[in-house]
Amino acid sequence: LGGTLCKIGSPLLSFLLCSLCTPLQAYILNHYSTEADYPWADTPRAAVFRHASNRKWFALMMEVPRDKLGLAGTEKLDIVNFKCDPILISSLRGETGIFPAYHMNKASWITAALDGSVPAETIELLLNVSYELTKPKPRRKAAKGKENE
């Protein structure tokens, strides 16, 4: 799985660095035809998923020290950030494995742990919401009489 979904340098490097090549990454590839982008050389395990047309992010998978999320310990934890409706964010606060967005706008992004503490259905819901919130908006038609101006 890691060798086919990740494109981080060599195939061996991709395989070795790819604990983030989760079923979520396969879901994103299969449902949205989107492969991970690795934009930062200094954090090769940070995977950005974005719309091809507008380049807006809809998911960011990375690992962070547990203490950055308010948890005990400094071990690394795989997480994913999603763009989210503020009402949904407030309803999910306090749920196990859900955190205020790490390194993003906390009013419109949310972080979910990828350690099994968040049900797969919740991850899928958050991914789909994020994808919809960040997709290109349809262009409005020009008002009558203004097409030729």
Could you tell me what each predicted segment is?
Residues 1-149:
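Charge-dense, helix-prone N-terminal extensions
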